[in-house]
Structures are given as structure tokens and as C-alpha cells.
Amino acid sequence: MQDNQPNPSPEPGSLAAGPSGRDDKNQRYWFHILAQNTHAARNLHAAKLVDKAWQQGDRVCVLCDTEEQAVELDDLLWNFTPEAFIPHSIAKAATTPCSDPVGILLYPPAAVDWDTVIVLSSALPEDADQYRRLALVAHNDPAVLNQARGHYKQLRSLGIEARVHDMRK
């Protein structure tokens, strides 16, 4: 017996939703500014974004500055929640590309390889306007916020007005 109730609408960005069809590239770029001022809070927020994007069928990478930062995020993703399993690995160089659905990269990601790019790095890749989706996560630390301002200006110079989710308010 078939259920005659209509299926609920798929989540935006999910595979079931198909291509977004959005012409406005600004809808794909977000800044997340956290109220907390710790690296741990930043990593936790990034892990939540990874989980959400991966659950929607995206291939996700997180761009980190250091191996220490990558290892911290790696540990967090393995222990994110008891019921979660996020298949991922660390890729230290472009010569050893990541084949997992989620990658923690120590080098700028190629836009064609990833659906969602999450930046924890101090440097925004030059081709940031080529990514399908881009999220930048900053915790409430003066140096990190200054980097975020630079990233925002860089995106504006590429013609992108990123959405800002300021959680300090």
C-alpha cells in the first residue's frame, strides 16, 4: 500500500533538491562570526557545518593553516557525536589528494574537487569565487576577526557580497 501523502520538500542544497538554480552567487558565501573566543569553539562550529553539508550529499573540505589545527579537527570529527560517522582524512599536500567525502586540507583546494569549502585558514584562496559554496568561520578573537575582515574585502573585490552570520549579537 502506497502512502498518498505528498513528500516533504527536500532540504535546500540536498541531492534531492537538485541543482539550486540560484543565479545569485552571493547566496553561496557565508561568514560565521562566533560569540566565543576559542579555537575549540571555532573547530566545533566547523564540524557542525561539515556534518550538515556532508549529510546533504556535499563533498566537503576544511582548509587549515597547520597540521596541529588539522589534527584537532580530525579528532573532533571522529568524536563529533556518538551517532555520527563522518568519513574524512587529512591531506597535507596536493600531491596526495583526498579521496574521502570530507577532507581536511593544508593546501588550497581545487574548486572542481569540492562542493563546500570551509575556511579556517588565515589565507583565503585566490580563486575563492570559483567554489560552489564557501563558509568562513571566525571566533571572537581580534587577530582572527582582522583576518576575517581581510577575507571579506577579498571576496568583495571578486564581486561577492557574502552573508554574515554574526553570533555575537
Model-flagged regions — what are they?
Residues 95-130:
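Mid-chain, well-packed structural core segment of small domains
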Residues 43-96:
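Short, well-structured hydrophobic secondary-structure segments
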Residues 132-169:
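Glycine-rich, aromatic-bearing surface loops/beta-hairpins
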Residues 37-39, 68-70, 110-112, 123-128, ...:
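Short acidic, S/G/P-rich loop/turn micro-motifs used as interaction or catalytic elements
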Residues 21-42:
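Glycine-rich phosphate-binding "P-loop"
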Residues 30-33, 59-65, 117-119, 136-137:
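Short hydrophobic beta-strand segments
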Residues 1-8:
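N-terminal acidic, proline/glycine-rich, low-complexity intrinsically disordered segments
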